[in-house]
């Protein structure tokens, strides 16, 4: 996670879990507050600087196709260290974050790497039973909400791994 949610990226600790939920505003699966479904769950395993991320995760950089008109969306590694001033970054061309988002993205200071994740998608999110739903923000937040005991919820997600569109389950 290298873009958006700067406060969450600054404050999240290694070992924390991050969950993405449907919402009223999600065009493909709008859901009412209190009825949100799980889009993804990911365990933070590393916090890297943007420079470290740039060097270690070349495969997460968007690239132009052969006709140089279309950019293939491979990921969020869009901030290249400035060779003349390594504390500054150059935003590479991409299809999802304009220059107007750069300051906000870089305020996050870190990129969160999640080596264990479960992606259900916004088109087929996972329904979580009421008794094990974690704390979910009522409105969009930049920092998230902490759930003290999320073990039952995490185990439920792991038991439904066959419904994932993509996973790197451990």
Which stretches of residues belong to each language-model region?
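Short N-terminal edge-element motif at the start of the domain
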Residues: 1-33
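A sequence-composition feature that detects small, non-aromatic residues
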Residues: 2, 7, 19, 42, ...
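Contiguous surface segments at macromolecular interaction interfaces
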Residues: 52-170
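Short beta-strand-centered aromatic/proline hotspots
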Residues: 29-31, 36-47
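Short, solvent-exposed loop/turn segments at secondary-structure junctions
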Residues: 24-26, 47-49, 124-125
């Amino acid at each position: 996670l290298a873009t958006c949610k700067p406060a969450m990226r600054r404050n999240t600790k290694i070992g924390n879990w991050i969950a993405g939920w449907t919402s009223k505003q999600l065009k493909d699966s709008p859901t009412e507050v209190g009825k949100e479904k799980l889009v993804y769950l990911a365990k933070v395993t590393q916090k890297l600087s943007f420079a470290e991320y740039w060097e270690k995760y070349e495969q997460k950089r968007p690239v132009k196709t052969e006709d140089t008109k279309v950019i293939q969306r491979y990921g969020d590694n869009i901030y290249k260290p400035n060779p003349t001033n390594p504390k500054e970054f150059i935003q590479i061309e991409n299809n999802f974050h304009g220059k107007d988002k750069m300051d906000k993205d870089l305020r996050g200071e870190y990129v969160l790497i999640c080596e264990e994740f479960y992606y259900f998608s916004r088109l087929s999110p996972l329904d979580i039973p009421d008794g094990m739903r974690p704390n979910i923000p009522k409105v969009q937040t930049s920092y998230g909400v902490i759930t003290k005991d999320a073990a039952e919820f995490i185990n439920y997600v792991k038991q439904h791994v066959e419904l994932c569109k993509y996973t790197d389950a451990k």
